[in-house]
Amino acid sequence: ACFELSRFADSLDAHFAIETGPETSATLKKFLDSLGSTGVAVNLDPANLVMVTGDDPAKAVYNLRDYIVHTHAKDGVQIFYKDPEIVYGIKKDPLVTGDSFEEVPLGEGSVKWDEYLAALNDIGYKGFLTIEREVGDDPEKDIGNAVNFLKGYMD
């Protein structure tokens, strides 16, 4: 199905972007390479990488450089490692309970923003950097703070 989807996107000179999440960037790259197309591409979410797999977002940028068409500005921390199949409800394990990660305001988590943004610049990424804030008591305030945080890298 993804092979057909990638070819359809190619025929439209478009991309279907899949968001990073339960897999490492190496696993995702292997899958995307198997399609032989960039019709199925990547929305790189650095927080999902650090929260779920513990993957380094800057290394993911270099690894997925040929496929990145969009990226999020989101931050988080991994509290403990939990199999991604358990995180996303594919498998159950009654012995593994509790939240294994937490989304936090931009700049307060484990994403190394200087390295991540430098990597995006190194590969020539010129697309959007969309602020995503899914939780928190005051998302509007968090988004405003995120704008200010990112401006510090763009001055």
Identify the residue ranges that each predicted region occupies.
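Active-site acidic/histidine proton-transfer and metal-coordination neighborhood
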Residues: 1-42, 51
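A structural alpha-helix within SAM-dependent methyltransferase catalytic domains
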Residues: 3-6, 10, 29-32, 36, ...
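A general structural motif
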Residues: 11-13, 37-39, 66-68, 124-128
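Active-site beta-loop-alpha junctions enriched in small/polar residues
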Residues: 14, 19-23, 45-49, 73-78, ...
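Conserved, mostly hydrophobic/aromatic
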Residues: 16, 45, 71, 106, ...
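Short alpha-helical
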Residues: 23-26, 111, 137-138
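Gly/Pro-rich active-site loop or hairpin
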Residues: 50-125, 140-144
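C-terminal helical cap(s) of enzyme catalytic domains, especially alpha/beta-barrels
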Residues: 139-155
